[in-house]
Structure formats: structure tokens, C-alpha cells
Amino acid sequence: MAKKTLILYYSWSGNTKKLAEKIHDQIEDSDLKAVEVADGTFDDDQYKTNDIALDQIQANSFPDIKLDNVDFNKYDLILIGSPVWSGYPATPIKTLLDQMQGYNGEIASFYTSAGANRKAYVNHFKEWVNDLNVVDVAENDSKIDEWVK
């Protein structure tokens, strides 16, 4: 029997959203929710957004997120999608992970990347989860079948 799965994602340009929707279509009875931030949190320019995110990381001051009230513990598995920004998950993901502390199920992350710092993403994601149970991190949807079994 497949695990009860929630797919959460943050998408700045739309690439991660497309991948999250594809994964949602692959997993029967999964739920899909977007993590959003207030308008003006980031710039329309990719490089300026990257600089804003690095400033947030350095200051340990992460953006507030908008997410419907979610009972994380009703899910066996939560998949978290993010773009890679300078080797880090997008900073709204840090806020999400902080809100998820106490979740007892499994977490896996998928990411979209223009090419650089993929290994750093895995390390930073695992640092940001604290005591949450991360089972895997993968680029795109390559391991979905393994995760939901």
C-alpha cells in the first residue's frame, strides 16, 4: 500500500511547480500544496533574488511563508520541492522545515537546478531539517517510486 503523501513545494520561476505537479500526478491520492511568500520578498531578477537569499541565510532571518493550515502528522511521507539557490534550498523552505519540527513521518526532497551546487543542496537541506527524518534527497523525480512504497 502506498504511503499517504503530501507534496510541498516552493517555486520562484515555475520549474519546481511543474515538477511538483508531475510528481503529484504520479502518486495516487497525494496532496499538493504550494509554499508561498509575500509579494516583494524576492526580486523578479534571478541574481538579485539569489543575493537576497544569501543575505537571509547569513542573517539567519528567513521569510515568512503562506501555507494553508496543514496537519503534517496525517501523512506518512512529505516530499519537499525547491529550486537550488547557491547550493541552498530556497529560503522559504527553511521556514517550512522549522514549522514542521515535531513531524514524525518521513521526508524526502526533490529539487530543480540550473546546474551548480547540487551536492551542497543535499548537505544544506539535511542541516536545515534538524531532527526530522530525511530518507532521501534527489534531483527531479528519479526516486519517487522508491519513496512512496
Predicted feature locations:
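N-terminal beta1-alpha1-beta2 submodule of the flavodoxin-like/Rossmannoid cofactor-binding fold
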Residues: 1-78, 87-89, 98, 131-134, ...
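Glycine-rich, N-terminal phosphate-binding loop of Rossmann-like dinucleotide-binding domains
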Residues: 82-83
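Alpha-helix N-cap/helix-start motif
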Residues: 89-90, 118
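Short alpha-helix in the alpha/beta-hydrolase fold that links the catalytic acid
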Residues: 92-97, 121-124
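A short helix->loop->beta-strand "cap" motif at the edges of active sites that frequently abuts
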Residues: 102-106
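Short, glycine-/small-residue-rich phosphate/pyrophosphate-handling segment
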Residues: 108-143
